[in-house]
Amino acid sequence: DEQHFLTQNGRRKNNGPFQFGSLEGSYEIDSLNLLTVGANLFHGKMTNRSEYTVNMQDINRNPVYDYNRNSDATETFGSTDVSVDYQHSTHKKDELLTISYRFSHSPNDNKDYTELKNVVNYNPWLGYPQNNINKASTNEHTGQVDYTTPTWKDQTLEVGAKYIFRQSRSNTDRTAFNDSLNIWEDITSKDSHFRHTQHIYSAYLGYSMKFDKFGVKAGVCKND
């Protein structure tokens, strides 16, 4: 194959602010019942702007093609988490029932615009300018129940169960400008839309014993 020389020069500018926040509050219904609510928020946005000059030369350093490529890209991401916990104690020492719920939303969206200018002897296989938009996120619901109770002296029984319902999605849409027809065309691939759902179940059983200065704990866990 004939040797060629590719030169690419340009500049890029990035910017990415972030925001964080959290809040938690509790309400003591009475001496045996406690309700706790919490929330956490994280949000970020990255922007990227680039300008490049691309030049191809043959083995004799004669120009083959030239063009300028400019791109603007934005990524938005983060998470929102909300939790609710209910704790119920009894008059029996160290006996405790906890019921918990968690919700989490994690978006991750991207979009970019790319154009070619000052094109000389270059024919890309797809039209330009191009728009690419991806919208993705994961939603997760988690419910959990935990129960702890003493049995005999220095012995404790623990049981619990958890259920997670998780939904993930990702949709990508692409358009390119057809210069000959003067229209935007959809060039989205058939496998660019994604959906996935998960149901996760788990349960555990534990038993602990203390003997003077020593302790023993055994347990089993089942996940599905």
Give the ranges of each region predicted by the language model.
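Primarily recognizes Gram-negative and organellar outer-membrane beta-barrels
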Residues: 1-224
